[in-house]
C-alpha cells in the first residue's frame, strides 16, 4: 500500500511538472500577440498623429499663403491707385503747361500788336513831316543852288534833317516804298491817275506822287502813283 501511495504521489508530481512546463509555452505566444497589438496600436496612432500634423502644417501654409496673397493684392491695389493718381497729375500738369504756353503766345502776340500799333501810329505821325521835307527839297531849283551858297546850305540842312528822320524810321522797321518803274501792285500802290506813255510798258508806275511806307514788310501807307494806261 505504501508502495502504491508513493507511485501515485510521483505520478501527480509528474503531471504537475508537465503542466508547469507546458504553461510558459502557451503564455509566450499570448504575450507576443499582446505586444504586437500594442505596437500596431502605437504605430497607427503615430501615423494618425503624423497625418494630423501634416494637415495642420498644410493648413498653416495655406493660411500664410492666403495672407501673403492678400497682402500682395492690397499692395497691387495701392500701386494701381498711385499709378492712376500719378497719371492724372501728369495730365493736369501737361494741360497747365500747355495753357501757360498758350497764354505766353497770346500775351506775346498782344504785346507785339500793341507795340506795332503804337509804332504804326508814331510812324504815320512822322510820315507827314518826312513828306514835308521832301516837298521842301523838291522846291529848290538846281540853278539857285549853284548861284547862292546860302540856298545851297539851306538845302543841305533840310536834306540832312530828312535823312535823320528816315534813318530813325528805318531803325524801327519802317522802310520807304518808292515803286517808280515797277509793275502796279494794288496791295502796295494807290493809282491816282492813268496816262498813256508810248515809251513805257502799260501797267507800270511812271510817276510817284507820294512815297509809300512799310512797317516790318507790312504796308502802312500805299504809294500814290501814276500808272501807264493799257492800250
From Swiss-Prot:
Q: Where is this region: Disordered?
A: 49-71
Where it mainly occurs, coarsely classed, is mitochondrion
Q: Which CDD domains match?
A: GrpE (cd00446)
Where does it reside?
Mitochondrion matrix
GO terms (BP aspect): protein import into mitochondrial matrix; protein refolding
Q: Which domain of life is it from?
A: Eukaryota
Which terms are listed as keywords in the entry?
A: Chaperone, Mitochondrion, Transit peptide
**Keyword Transit peptide set for record:** yes
The GO cellular component terms are: PAM complex, Tim23 associated import motor
Q: Which InterPro entries match?
A: GrpE, GrpE_coiled_coil, GrpE_head
Hey, which family's this protein in? Belongs to the GrpE family.
Function, as annotated, reads: Essential component of the PAM complex, a complex required for the translocation of transit peptide-containing proteins from the inner membrane into the mitochondrial matrix in an ATP-dependent manner. Seems to control the nucleotide-dependent binding of SSC1 to substrate proteins.
Q: How does it assemble?
A: Component of the PAM complex, at least composed of mtHsp70, MGE1, TIM44, PAM16, PAM17 and PAM18.
The name under which this protein is listed is: GrpE protein homolog, mitochondrial
Please report the organism this UniProt entry assigns to the protein: Candida glabrata (strain ATCC 2001 / BCRC 20586 / JCM 3761 / NBRC 0622 / NRRL Y-65 / CBS 138)
